[in-house]
């Protein structure tokens, strides 16, 4: 059987309106798509399940409402065949911890999404609280990685300290601003001793 005959699972996707300051309207439009659009694109690529977080909970940078985004996703995802949810935790929004506590018990929620860049915090300062929370719930954690607040090597101590978590470093090859050193995620995984650090493409 050809590998292309197997349905895929996309563990890192978003739905909603993309807005990056400094991007053209066309770039923002091309990166946008409602839940139905995301599923339609996935189907064309033989992707059976797509795990999403809402862009409204991440963007615009430093101004997104993660709590409102989580509520939106908890409504939209169960109604959209082919989608599953990451619940977003923003350490600056205490209510997102409470939402995660509740949503992690739902069959459509696969784990926790962290985005230190969009929520403007260094993972080195907030990682212990975030990963202790995740470890207590044995949660999978998808993290943006490769930029100033989210260097892959900065996640390694938390993955080591909290082996109950499974941590996915997003953006294989992102060494900063979608450029830089393309080996940073791989080197962090090579240094891991607990076998709980992964990467997505």
Where are these regions (language model features)?
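Catalytic pocket-lining loop regions of alpha/beta-barrel enzymes
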Residues: 110, 121-201
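Mid-domain alpha/beta scaffold segments of enzyme catalytic cores
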Residues: 1-129, 133, 137, 191-194, ...
């Amino acid at each position: 059987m050809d590998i292309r005959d197997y349905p895929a699972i996309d563990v890192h996707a978003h739905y909603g309106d993309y807005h990056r300051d400094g991007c053209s309207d066309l770039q923002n439009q091309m990166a946008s798509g409602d839940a139905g659009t995301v599923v339609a694109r996935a189907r064309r690529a033989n992707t059976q399940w797509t795990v999403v977080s809402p862009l409204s909970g991440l963007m615009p940078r430093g101004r997104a409402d993660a709590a409102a985004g989580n509520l939106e996703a908890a409504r939209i995802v169960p109604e959209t065949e082919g989608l599953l949810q990451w619940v977003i935790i923003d350490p600056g929004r205490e209510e997102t911890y409470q939402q995660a506590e509740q949503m992690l018990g739902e069959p459509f929620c696969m784990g926790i999404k962290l985005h230190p860049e969009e929520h403007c915090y260094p993972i080195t300062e907030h990682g212990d609280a975030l990963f202790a929370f995740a470890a207590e719930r044995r949660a999978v954690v998808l993290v943006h990685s490769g930029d100033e607040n989210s260097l892959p090597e900065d996640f390694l101590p938390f993955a080591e300290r909290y082996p109950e978590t499974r941590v996915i470093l997003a953006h294989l090859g992102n060494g900063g601003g979608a450029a830089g050193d393309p080996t940073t995620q791989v080197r962090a995984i090579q240094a891991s001793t607990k076998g709980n650090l992964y990467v997505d493409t």
